């Protein structure tokens, strides 16, 4: 059984320790300001495809609960751009929330990981979101997902909240 509590909540952490629950992992909420004039890495194609709520996929039903969902896709410029719509090398989902946008399910094809494609994709995506009027972007990531943590730190995200999970 798992319990969760805010990392700052010392009284809950003491109670969980008293019953023998052990810290298992943390989930972080990360955020980053969006800047229109930000430098974009060359060599990447990025497109945001707006999706109507009735076209939601199973992957994004739980996140948006009826709101608009966007799908962002990317590929290296040396690839066939029209093919990127059916076989993108990088994908993510975006859920607009007022002046912020929530990013989730960022994926790079396994055979292309550790080649800076995620960094290049975010460098192209983030200014596009700023041009759409968004002020910040938010996401959630597990402390166990070290490659994702490194990517987000490298691209300017910072931790705004920590939720700790304890196993009992």
Predicted regions mapped to residue ranges:
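Flexible, substrate/cofactor-facing loop regions flanked by secondary structure
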Residues: 40-110
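Residue-level recognition of the GNAT/N-acetyltransferase active site
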Residues: 6, 109, 113, 142
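Acyl-donor-binding surface of acyltransferase catalytic domains
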Residues: 1-43, 166-168
């Amino acid at each position: 059984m798992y319990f969760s509590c805010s990392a700052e909540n010392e009284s809950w952490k003491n109670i969980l320790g008293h019953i023998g629950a052990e810290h298992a992992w943390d989930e972080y909420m990360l955020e980053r300001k969006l800047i229109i004039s930000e430098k974009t890495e060359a060599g990447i194609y990025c497109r945001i495809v707006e999706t109507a709520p009735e076209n939601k996929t199973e992957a994004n039903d739980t996140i948006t609960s009826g709101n608009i969902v966007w799908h962002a896709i990317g590929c290296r410029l040396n690839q066939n751009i029209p093919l990127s719509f059916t076989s993108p090398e990088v994908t993510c989902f975006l859920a607009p929330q007022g002046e912020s946008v929530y990013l989730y399910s960022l994926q790079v094809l396994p055979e292309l990981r550790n080649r800076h494609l995620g960094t290049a994709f975010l460098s192209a995506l983030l200014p596009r979101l700023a041009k759409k009027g968004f002020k910040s972007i938010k996401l959630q990531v597990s402390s166990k997902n070290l490659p994702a943590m490194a990517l987000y730190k490298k691209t300017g995200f910072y931790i705004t909240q920590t939720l700790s999970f304890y196993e009992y």
